[in-house]
């Protein structure tokens, strides 16, 4: 698996692995990547079956598979310990990593995640799946902003949405891959395992997320033994994209509380 690893900002800098959501592309993190690279060696990547890591996913592909693939790829690059920043699906992959490799994951930040798939989010995913199967990839991609962004932000950023739509159509991961990734996402359930997570976790969510209700993060917070919950008043499902300054401020505060502050050694 191909990873994009930035130069360490100073010797011994901690590593931050950024895992995107269902779309799978590492480019999702532009608004955080540059800022975090001042204090972390940042790792971004396109998930298996997407972008630079094109592949045909097997039937029965799971989030556990996604976590194992990433952990192996990091080990091949000599990365033994790292923090994880994950959005939705990416945050759940982070939970899988924390459960399977607790000594490797120093901290975990989950954006708009959940303990188990709620009825509303399942309805949204089922509707998107029907769009994909009945109307094709172009219609699926065109509808995606309805679930990701607040209406006012979307209206004010129409040129950006058009550019994103063109890019997503050009690099569409394929119907079968997307359906298998959706299946992995919909079947993940942490109700029986969350209490075993020893990694400190920050949960960030937005009250106006129309895809994943913010109360899903609240339920996850209550189930995790070592977590903090930060609720943004607005920003939608992709709140780190639509409100990066507010999001980054919460992220930095959370990371400071979860882990020792990264710093350059002085002599």
Swiss-Prot record:
Involved in pyrimidine catabolism. May facilitate the hydrolysis of carbamate, a reaction that can also occur spontaneously. It is an enzyme of class 3 (hydrolase). It catalyses: carbamate + 2 H(+) = NH4(+) + CO2. It comes from Cronobacter turicensis (strain DSM 18703 / CCUG 55852 / LMG 23827 / z3032). GO terms for molecular function: hydrolase activity, acting on carbon-nitrogen (but not peptide) bonds, in linear amides. The gene is rutD. It comes from the Bacteria. SUPFAM superfamilies: alpha/beta-Hydrolases. GO terms for biological process: nitrogen utilization; uracil catabolic process. Signal peptide: none annotated. PANTHER family: MONOACYLGLYCEROL LIPASE. Its EC number is 3.5.1.-. This is Putative carbamate hydrolase RutD. Belongs to the AB hydrolase superfamily. Hydrolase RutD family.
């Amino acid at each position: 698996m191909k990873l994009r690893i930035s130069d360490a900002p100073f010797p011994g800098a901690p590593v931050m692995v950024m895992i995107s959501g269902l779309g799978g592309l590492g480019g999702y993190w532009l608004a955080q990547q540059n800022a975090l690279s001042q204090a972390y060696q940042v790792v971004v990547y396109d998930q298996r079956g997407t972008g630079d890591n094109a592949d045909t996913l097997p039937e029965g592909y799971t989030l556990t598979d996604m976590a194992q693939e990433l952990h192996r790829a990091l080990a091949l690059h000599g990365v033994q310990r790292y923090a994880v920043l994950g959005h939705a699906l990416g945050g759940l992959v982070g939970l899988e990593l924390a459960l399977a490799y607790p000594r490797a994951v120093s901290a975990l930040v989950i954006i708009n995640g959940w303990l188990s798939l709620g009825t509303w989010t399942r309805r949204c995913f089922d509707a998107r799946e029907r769009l994909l199967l009945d109307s094709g990839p172009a219609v699926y991609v065109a509808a995606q902003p309805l679930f990701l962004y607040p209406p006012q932000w979307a209206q004010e950023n129409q040129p950006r949405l058009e550019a994103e739509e063109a890019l997503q159509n050009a690099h569409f991961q394929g119907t079968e891959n997307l359906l298998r990734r959706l299946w992995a996402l919909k079947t993940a359930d942490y109700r029986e395992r969350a209490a075993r997570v020893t990694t400190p976790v920050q949960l960030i969510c937005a009250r106006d997320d129309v895809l994943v209700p913010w109360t899903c993060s609240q339920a996850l917070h209550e189930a995790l033994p070592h977590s903090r919950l930060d609720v943004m008043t607005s920003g939608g499902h992709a709140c780190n994209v639509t409100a990066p300054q507010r999001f980054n401020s919460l992220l930095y505060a959370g990371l400071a509380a979860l882990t020792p502050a990264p710093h350059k050694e002085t002599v």
